[in-house]
């Protein structure tokens, strides 16, 4: 199943780059030397660049990062799909359309960002335990700040979750299928 998630991510990023090219869009991010990323394109000089911004592209990682520290800290086994989802690429968060709803996939910008993600994931899992709800792993944000898209750690399904209340609906049987259904959209600056 993890190979299917990798393949779906590769195809999704290819679709993103195709949309960017077709729409003559340049992905860019405000440059902060203290928040560097392997995604930044060195010496990017493009007429579309905003002042203080630098062009970037998603970068495939050499190896998938591990969530073993979370598993050890919380005595939980995480669905292996989540390590592939967050550990295959470095990228800015990616806007996409799913069933005509605009969402934003949470992605990892750098190794430091991966550490921050792990801290947030631990806090999320601890909150789920406190609320006596099944463990979920967030993967995307929604327009409604009280909703997230998450991976159900028990079933492996992709679900919509209302924060504090739990799972409200199943969106896809697994992460690969969910990613395959995404349509890239241009981010708003």
What are these regions (language model features)?
Residues 1-145:
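A surface-exposed partner-binding patch
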Residues 132-135, 151-157:
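Short, solvent-exposed coil/turn segments at beta-strand boundaries
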